[in-house]
Amino acid sequence: MLKLLSEIGPVIAFFAGFFYGGGIQNATLYMLITAIICVTICYFVDKKVSKLSIISVSVLLVSGIITLISGNSIYIKIKPTILYVIFGIIFLMSGIRKNPFIKYALESIVRLKEESWITLSYRAAAFFFFMAVVNEIVWRNFSDETWVKFKVFGVIPITFIFILLQLPLLLKNKLPDSKI
């Protein structure tokens, strides 16, 4: 539950900052502060921070600080695209190399046959590349307000649907000692 909150907390802070705090600059500041707090709490509770979280927060810090200094919102808008492409490449390459990164991220929750991890890696890569394209379309063609709403009311449900669509693969190929 803590991991989920640390992932969506900064997005919620961004949304609230945009609509109640006066625009993208304040939203970016709120998201940066929330992300740093969430990662710090996760570190003290779990004694570790995942590699994906480190990558996410690092890209957020760079794009967020540049956005705040320059006053140009393009940097915070391309942050999701950059992250999605990085994650897509990580999952694609780990699938190609037959050493699925997703296995290390999810193995504590579910144990699968090895070929299923590879399939899941390719699916995750396709999902992240798709999300990169969608983010580019939305921020380049719609208002800041629409883009911010999409981050909350679009990205979260799309991600949830993607996860649900993976359940048949997970349930069919889970090992007997799996937690799900």
UniProtKB/Swiss-Prot annotation:
For this protein, the record's Pfam families field holds: IspA (PF04279)
**May I have one GO cellular component term?**
plasma membrane
Source superkingdom: Bacteria
Chain segments annotated as transmembrane: 25-45, 54-74, 76-96, 118-138, 150-170
Subcellular location(s) of the protein: Cell inner membrane
The UniProt keyword set, sorted, is: Cell inner membrane, Cell membrane, Membrane, Transmembrane, Transmembrane helix
User: Would I find Zinc-finger among this entry's keywords?
Assistant: no
Protein purpose: Plays a role in cell envelope biogenesis, maintenance of cell envelope integrity and membrane homeostasis.
Which protein family is named in the record? Answer: Belongs to the YciB family.
Q: What is this protein called?
A: Inner membrane-spanning protein YciB
Q: Which organism is it from?
A: Rickettsia canadensis (strain McKiel)
Q: Which gene encodes it?
A: yciB
